[in-house]
Swiss-Prot record:
Consists of three domains: the N-terminal catalytic domain, the editing domain and the C-terminal anticodon-binding domain. It is found in: Cytoplasm. The keyword Magnesium does not apply. It comes from the Bacteria. Its EC number is 6.1.1.15. This is Proline--tRNA ligase. One of its GO terms (cellular component) is cytosol.
């Protein structure tokens, strides 16, 4: 099939859009694939839809290969099922909410777990109907606070979401692995590099979660991996916990004067000058216990102060803290928050004071106190004494203070040991391109999805959820393959197989171009034909680079002698070829 550029609904641009932050956003707009309608909302033009449809076709082929069947749900749905599972509140302001004319609460769906479960509940009642895998490719809606990077993080986006239904955990494991394998094949066909990492389940819930991340400098996610094969999203990384230390024989806690120590560094310098260690080693930041006050806003609107104790050589990672305290919103405590707790002396906060415990559910303040996993029983710390100008030495966990719990909220750094013992980790940046979950029975229990098992007993169905961002993957392919001059699509999702550029004037050139396009069409190739009569060769070549079809055929003055040029955009090499040989050259490997 051939498409004439003179008739195609497209307008290429010479200037970058002013709001574009990344190359894929700039080039998809300039090449006429998408147009911005509002922040995070884009219209898809014919070129963009061609690529988007090809991405969807690859996903459909791989879903059908594992026996998943396609369905389609509305984007506009009643709120009640989301309320039943608790996600109506958990999503917070990220969910688009509205009411119909009868004042019934509705949503623009961010995801469809509840409705897939209800559909299966409505139609199936026996284990003999299972296992079942169904999926859809549908637009989703999330009210992003800061839409960015074009279609990489928008408020409307297209996803493939699949769901598996089994009546046993063993069956779920099989379904999960089938989807996971299908995802690997999809990303390989798209030509996207990926890393599979352990991930936090977040609002989705469930017992197991893995992300497929595409390593990229523009990624908004941090992941870590070790030489021995460990890989995790930084939010799911677990600290290697040291052994507890015997408490007996350790020095008693002792308060010392520490004026003018606003930072951990100044505190360490003072301790080394005035309170040298008995073993002769110098104090370091890792010997101090930093106590960070966070404010949690719970789903019911209540606000709670929590103090997190971490080694002083670490900082709080708010993303990890959000996971630790989910579904509450997390932010640093304000001056107003601290004013309501006069028992906490800013700059000198600690779990203990000479008058007794200051932090924890049984303390004088009743402020919840949680600590980093490295704060094990018997570990000894320098920390605030809750008295202005004073710190305490040799404060021992399990003897002098007992935290309310342990949280993973400290930052993760290169060189930290992997929790499975597979070596030191290194961190990288990436963007999520797929996510697979073993949901278990969370949604089925909330919605009453049960079937009769082999013994005639009602059992709750166990589910899996599997998502791929169609539009995000398209943008990341564009980002990864562009060469600065324009887009450069892999053949698997290029909008056309070949781009024929007619240059020069005269009936012979026009006739040769038309005949070549017809021959390529007859050979089964999808052809974009730049037949624009009043456009210079330079502009045509610039547009060809911008649009990004990887194979270009130039038909110019050489056509009089039966010659054309093959232009390989990947290598930027141009090769003379006889017009009669073009079709054979382009179909040899098909």
């Amino acid at each position: 099939m051939s498409t004439r550029l003179s008739k195609l609904f497209v307008r290429t641009l010479r200037e970058d859009p002013v709001d574009a932050e990344v190359a894929s956003h700039r080039l998809l707009v300039r090449a006429g694939y998408i147009r911005r309608q509002a922040p995070g909302i884009f219209a898809w033009l014919p070129l963009g839809l061609r690529v988007k449809n090809k991405v969807e076709a690859i996903v459909r082929e791989e879903m059908e290969r594992i026996g998943a069947q396609e369905v389609h749900f509305p984007a506009l749905l009643p709120a009640e099922p989301y309320q039943a599972t608790g996600r109506y509140d958990e999503y917070g302001p990220g969910m688009f909410r509205l009411e119909d004319r009868k004042r019934a609460p509705m949503v623009l769906a961010p995801t469809h777990e509840e409705f897939f479960a209800l559909l299966v509940k409505d139609l199936y009642s026996s284990y003999k109907d299972l296992p079942l895998s169904i999926y859809q490719i549908q637009d989703k809606y999330r009210d992003e606070a800061r839409p960015r990077a074009g279609i990489l993080r928008g408020r409307e986006f297209t996803m493939k979401d699949a769901y598996s239904f089994d009546h046993t955990d063993a069956g779920l494991a099989v379904s999960y692995q089938a989807q996971r394998d299908a995802y690997e094949r999809i990303f390989q066909r798209l030509g996207l590099e990926y890393v599979i990492v352990a991930a936090d389940a977040g609002a989705m819930g469930g017992s197991k979660s893995e992300e497929f991340l595409h390593p990229t400098p523009i990624g908004e996610d941090t992941f870590v991996r070790s030489p021995g094969g460990y890989a995790a999203n930084v939010e799911a990384f677990t600290t290697l916990v040291p052994e507890s230390i015997p408490i007996e024989g350790q020095s008693a806690a002792r308060v010392f004067d520490s004026p003018d120590t606003p930072t951990i560094a100044t505190l360490v310098d003072l301790a080394n000058a005035r309170e040298p260690r008995e073993d002769g080693r110098a104090w370091t930041a890792a010997d101090t216990l930093k106590n960070i006050v966070l404010a949690l806003t719970h789903l019911d609107g209540t606000r709670e102060l929590v103090v997190v104790g971490i080694p002083g050589d670490r900082d709080i990672d708010l993303k990890r803290a959000e996971v630790a305290f989910f579904p509450a919103e997390v932010e640093p405590a304000t001056e107003g928050d601290l004013a309501k707790q006069p028992g906490l002396v800013k700059g000198y906060i600690g779990p203990w004071s000479p008058e007794g415990p200051v932090l924890g559910s049984t303390s004088s303040t009743k402020v919840r106190y949680v600590v980093d996993p490295r704060v094990v029983d018997g570990s000894s710390w320098i920390t605030g004494a809750n008295v202005a100008g004073k710190h305490v030495l040799s404060l021992v966990a399990g003897r002098d203070f007992t935290p309310d719990g342990v949280v993973e909220a400290a930052d993760v750094r290169d060189g930290d040991p992997a929790p499975d013992g597979s070596g030191p980790i290194t961190a990288g940046r990436g963007t999520e391109i797929g996510h697979v979950f073993e949901l278990g029975r969370k949604y089925a229990e909330a919605l009453g999805l049960k079937v009769l098992d082999e013994n005639g007993k009602l059992v709750t169905v166990t589910m899996g959820s599997y998502g791929i961002g169609i539009t995000r993957n398209l943008a990341l392919v564009a980002e990864a393959t562009q060469d600065g001059r324009g887009l450069l699509w892999p053949a698997s999702i290029s909008p056309f197989d070949v781009h024929v550029v007619m240059t020069g004037k005269g009936d012979e050139i026009a006739s040769a171009s038309e005949e070549l396009v017809d021959a390529l069409d007859a050979a089964g190739l999808d052809v974009l034909f730049d037949d624009r009569p009043k456009v210079s060769p330079g502009v045509k070549f610039g547009d060809a680079e911008l649009i990004g079809v990887p194979t270009i055929v130039i038909v110019g003055r050489g056509a009089v002698d039966g010659m054309a040029e093959l232009w390989d955009r990947r290598t930027n090499e141009r090769t003379p070829v006889a017009l009669a040989d073009v079709v054979g050259a382009l179909t040899a490997d098909r």
